[in-house]
Swiss-Prot record:
Keyword Transferase attributed: no
GO molecular function: box H/ACA snoRNA binding
Record-stated family: Belongs to the eukaryotic ribosomal protein eL8 family.
Protein name: H/ACA ribonucleoprotein complex subunit 2-like protein
Coiled-coil parts of chain: none
Principal place of residence: nucleus
Function: Required for ribosome biogenesis. Part of a complex which catalyzes pseudouridylation of rRNA. This involves the isomerization of uridine such that the ribose is subsequently attached to C5, instead of the normal N1. Pseudouridine ('psi') residues may serve to stabilize the conformation of rRNAs.
Gene3D superfamilies assigned: 3.30.1330.30
Subunit-structure text: Component of the small nucleolar ribonucleoprotein particle containing H/ACA-type snoRNAs (H/ACA snoRNPs). Component of the telomerase holoenzyme complex.
An annotated GO cellular component: telomerase holoenzyme complex
InterPro entries: eL8/uL1-like, H/ACA_rnp_Nhp2-like, Ribosomal_eL30-like_sf, Ribosomal_eL8/eL30/eS12/Gad45, Ribosomal_eL8/Nhp2
Length: 150
């Protein structure tokens, strides 16, 4: 029994369970639009990681919704593989009403781990900060240039 646990732990350390971008795209839900490209997803994950270090993120549907209603600004990043979609389908509309840039990334597991959490996360808001201003501005520019859903 302990041997099996060691094998699983070894796989996680070497990255044996990582999926490619194409495999992750196959699991996205129908409302995941605009979906970030592989390159933009990587930039967003890095920006989330930098923001988490200085505690400038909002994590989870309830918290993000609360701060959108309060008028806080930032980039909203959604996980495209969240099911059921009823959990967060109202948030993109709230972002559009308040003209906040938002994008979908293919994996909630990757989004959660980039925020420094062991749990998957379906939505994160990245707030602007001076320490990662360059990366943040680059992400805002690319996210706003994505085609908006109709």
């Amino acid at each position: 029994m302990t041997k099996v646990k060691k094998e699983k732990a070894g796989e996680e350390e070497t990255g044996g369970t990582e999926k490619s971008y194409q495999e992750l795209i196959a699991n996205i839900n129908p409302i995941a639009n605009p979906l970030a490209s592989r390159k933009l997803s990587k930039k967003l994950y890095k920006c989330v990681k930098k923001a988490a270090k200085v505690k400038q993120i909002r994590r989870g549907v309830k918290e993000v919704q609360k701060f959108i209603n309060k008028g806080e600004t930032g980039i909203v990043v959604f996980a495209g593989d969240t099911l059921p979609i009823d959990v967060y389908c109202h948030l993109p509309i709230m972002c559009e009403d308040r003209s906040l840039p938002y994008a979908y990334v293919p994996s909630k597991v990757d989004l959660g781990s980039s925020a420094g959490s062991k749990r998957p996360t379906c939505v994160i808001m990245i707030k602007p900060h001076d320490e990662y201003k360059e990366a943040y501005d680059e992400c805002v520019e690319e996210v706003t240039s994505l085609p908006k859903p109709i």
